Amino acid sequence: MLLKLAPAFTLLNSHGENLSPMLSTSSQGFVLKNFSTKSRNGLLVVCASKGSNTKPLTGVVFEPFEEVKKELMLVPTVPQVSLARHKYSDQCEAAVNEQINVEYNVSYVYHGMYAYFDRDNVALKGLARFFKESSEEERGHAEKLMEYQNKRGGKVKLQSILMPLSEFDHAEEGDALYAMELALSLAKLTNQKLLNLHAVATRNNDVQLADFVESKYLREQVEAIKMISEYVAQLRRVGKGHGVWHFDQMLLQEEEVVA
């Protein structure tokens, strides 16, 4: 039964409490819902109906102590097993270790380039600083991956690093252009390795690893490829002669401004 009341009407219970919030408006006044009415001695008596439902809207009640029992049984008790590891597959762990090795190898190559251009008979200080900073950046990438490996409960397994080149002079291109083209190739190779790591994470439904690779590596790698590509284009324009020195000075000044 629905009871229509005038807008100015105030409904009180036996204790004098206002029940007006229980009213919903309509075009003709107020409609009282979930209440039954009856007349007693000429007075209107309103009683709460039994149709109210206090169950959760979704029908699902979260019971943490019941649901955590399964996870509690999986907590390792052996000291050699990681306590933090959760939803981290062996494939993802191995792929992260491979990427650590890639970053260290690229860092080693860049460090060799830094040593070459810092020689007294080469003396291209701008290129030397650029490759030294690039080497430190790649090593930082490797260390960041190592930290992530430990964070996820994996084990860091360092692999061997190949000996890099020590000479970068090229008969046709010259040392500056040859080294920068090599750096561009390494940047693209690193990007491909990162894409492979992201694919492994996606294949194993590891959303956290995929997000880590996207946010910390892939965006930055695209920017590095663009920057090195511009350096290659500029070095191709200036040739092997006096223009290389001007390019090196420009590079040195840019790095000093950034620093």
From Swiss-Prot:
- The positions annotated for binding Fe cation 1 are 103, 138, 141
- According to its UniProt record, which protein family does this protein belong to? Belongs to the ferritin family.
Entry EC number(s): 1.16.3.1
Q: What class of enzyme is it?
A: oxidoreductase
Q: Where in the cell is it found?
A: Plastid, Chloroplast
Q: Give a short account of what the protein does.
A: Stores iron in a soluble, non-toxic, readily available form. Important for iron homeostasis. Has ferroxidase activity. Iron is taken up in the ferrous form and deposited as ferric hydroxides after oxidation.
Every Ferritin-like diiron domain range:
86-239
How does the annotation summarize its subunit structure?
A: Oligomer of 24 subunits. There are two types of subunits: L (light) chain and H (heavy) chain. The major chain can be light or heavy, depending on the species and tissue type. The functional molecule forms a roughly spherical shell with a diameter of 12 nm and contains a central cavity into which the insoluble mineral iron core is deposited.
Q: Does the keyword Chloroplast apply?
A: yes
Q: Which GO terms describe its cellular component?
A: chloroplast; cytoplasm
Indicate yes or no for the key word ATP-binding: no
Which keywords annotate this record? Chloroplast, Iron, Iron storage, Metal-binding, Oxidoreductase, Plastid, Transit peptide
Classify the main location: plastid
| Alphabetical GO biological process terms | intracellular iron ion homeostasis; iron ion transport
SUPFAM superfamilies per record: Ferritin-like (SSF47240)
| Region of interest (Extension peptide (EP)), residue spans | 53-85
Where does the chain bind Fe cation 2? 138, 221
Question: What is any Pfam family matched here?
Answer: Ferritin
Transit peptide range is 1-52
Provide the protein name.
Ferritin-2, chloroplastic
Q: Which Gene3D superfamilies match?
A: 1.20.1260.10
GO terms (molecular function) for this protein are: ferric iron binding; ferrous iron binding; ferroxidase activity
Reactions catalysed according to its record? 4 Fe(2+) + O2 + 4 H(+) = 4 Fe(3+) + 2 H2O
